[in-house]
């Protein structure tokens, strides 16, 4: 598992470093967009988050006599995704706490990459959401809008109001939100890059988005606004795909189940957004889904 993201009996030349490097490249458009939309503080948060994750992993591994694996880019990806899940107004020290919790507690305590049960970046976000919720509730408006802060599309619709932004605004990213989640267009560019490189499970993402679209339409919600708001695009393209799945059926079930939970939380939950919670919940079920749908390898004589 040190070099490979897949089950050992599935032969693939793709290494962890190669895949994670491409994920970093795929996240560049959204990172550039966050700086354009929210200013250079967005860049500062991203750089600090990556630096803390990489340094935290290296120091932990050195202190415990383990091989230092920061060259596989997985810690850098975690740092970028944590920054993408916070607002430009979030204090730097809060982001640092999320980074350290994600890298040390969620990732290293469980044995490092490939051994952690849940997504470290999302657990880092959940940690600061539980400990310092007020620090994550303020969302800045894009710089070309003459308002300092405002409600997100999901918050406005949750309270029974109008979205307040056009669908085009939501697609392009000219809406309040976390750094890396507002522009569906820029995220899509990165996702297509990974799909062309065959380094993302498109089946999971397709099942996830289709489920959200169908269910929200069935319940009388605007499915297009639902797809373009909150962390749905970021989560569906970069955090829902699970590189450890070997069966197509398992991947589809994973995507569908995550989509169902997202819609349930958005409709009946206390919070307007449910992507983070849904992904983490289904992360915990991924082993069961894999075992139910994969061929068992018992060895040879």
Predicted regions and their residues:
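Alpha-helical transmembrane segments in multi-pass membrane proteins
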Residues: 22-30, 45-57, 74-79, 83, ...
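Structural signature of hydrophobic alpha-helical transmembrane segments
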Residues: 39-51, 89-98, 170-182, 220-232
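Cytosolic-side transmembrane-helix boundaries in multi-pass membrane proteins
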Residues: 1-19, 265-301
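Loop-to-transmembrane alpha-helix initiation sites
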Residues: 117, 121, 224-232, 251-254, ...
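Long hydrophobic alpha-helical segments that form multi-pass transmembrane helix bundles
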Residues: 114-188
């Amino acid at each position: 598992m040190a070099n490979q993201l897949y089950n050992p009996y599935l032969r693939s030349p793709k290494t962890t470093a190669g895949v994670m490097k491409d994920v970093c490249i795929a996240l560049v458009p959204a990172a550039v967009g966050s700086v354009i939309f929210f200013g250079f503080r967005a860049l500062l948060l991203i750089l600090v988050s990556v630096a803390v994750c990489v340094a935290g992993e290296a120091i932990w591994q050195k202190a415990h006599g383990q091989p230092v694996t920061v060259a596989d880019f997985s810690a850098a990806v975690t740092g970028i995704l944590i920054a993408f899940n916070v607002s430009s107004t979030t204090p730097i020290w809060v982001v640092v706490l999320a980074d350290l919790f994600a890298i040390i507690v969620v990732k290293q305590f469980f044995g490092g990459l490939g051994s952690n049960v849940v997504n470290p970046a999302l657990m880092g976000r959940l940690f600061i959401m539980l400990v310092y919720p007020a620090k994550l509730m303020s969302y800045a408006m894009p710089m070309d809008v003459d308002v300092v802060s405002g409600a997100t599309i999901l918050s406005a619709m949750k309270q029974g109001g109008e979205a307040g932004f056009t669908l085009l605004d939501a697609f392009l990213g000219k809406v309040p939100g976390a750094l890396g989640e507002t522009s569906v267009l820029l995220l899509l560019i990165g996702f297509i890059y990974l799909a062309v490189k065959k380094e993302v499970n498109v089946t999971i993402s397709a099942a996830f988005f289709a489920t959200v679209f169908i269910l929200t339409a069935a319940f009388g919600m605007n499915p297009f606004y639902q797809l373009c708001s909150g962390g749905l695009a970021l989560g569906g393209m970069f955090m829902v795909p699970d590189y450890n799945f070997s069966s197509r059926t398992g991947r589809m079930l994973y995507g569908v189940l995550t989509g169902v939970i997202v819609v349930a939380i958005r409709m009946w939950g206390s919070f307007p957004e449910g992507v983070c919670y849904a992904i983490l919940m289904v992360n915990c079920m991924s082993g069961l889904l894999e075992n139910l749908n994969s061929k068992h390898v018992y060895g040879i004589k």
